Amino acid sequence: MSKLKITNARRKQRVRIALRRAAGGRPRLSVFRSSKHIYAQVIDDQKGETLASASSLEKTMREGGKTGANIDAAKAVGKLLAERAVKNGVKEVVFDRGGYLYHGRVKALADAARESGLSF
């Protein structure tokens, strides 16, 4: 395994351990990004169910002409996810960046979710 993959795997483990300690029963906002799209979901780990989700693959996003590979799409996904989560009664979450650096698309999604009503 390359040194970069080992470093990324260790970072992901550290993030998960810290989240478990800090969660305090709050749902987790999990982010996954690929080279072409970005996905986010609010997960209740105690019940094992997804409370809200959004991605750049959704029809409303594609009709808007936004690809998932840029910051604008990440902002739109964050806003959409926050609206759905607030509608389902979730206002406080723990942000799970999934080992990704808090920069670029991940940061844009988090900022948009905060602006739309989620607190973390």
UniProtKB/Swiss-Prot annotation:
Q: Name one GO molecular function term.
A: 5S rRNA binding
Keyword annotations = Ribonucleoprotein, Ribosomal protein, RNA-binding, rRNA-binding
Question: Pfam families, alphabetically?
Answer: Ribosomal_L18p
The family database entries (Gene3D superfamilies) matched by this protein are listed as:
3.30.420.100
Chain's role: This is one of the proteins that bind and probably mediate the attachment of the 5S RNA into the large ribosomal subunit, where it forms part of the central protuberance.
**What GO cellular component term, any one, is given?**
cytosolic large ribosomal subunit
What is annotated about its quaternary structure and interactions?
A: Part of the 50S ribosomal subunit; part of the 5S rRNA/L5/L18/L25 subcomplex. Contacts the 5S and 23S rRNAs.
**Record NCBIfam families:** L18_bact (TIGR00060)
Q: What is one GO biological process annotated to this record?
A: translation
* Source organism (scientific name): Afipia carboxidovorans (strain ATCC 49405 / DSM 1227 / KCTC 32145 / OM5)
- SUPFAM superfamilies, alphabetized: Translational machinery components
Tagged with keyword Cytoplasm: no
The Swiss-Prot or TrEMBL record describes its family as follows: Belongs to the universal ribosomal protein uL18 family.
Protein name (database record) = Large ribosomal subunit protein uL18
Name the PANTHER family for this protein. 39S RIBOSOMAL PROTEIN L18, MITOCHONDRIAL, LARGE RIBOSOMAL SUBUNIT PROTEIN UL18M
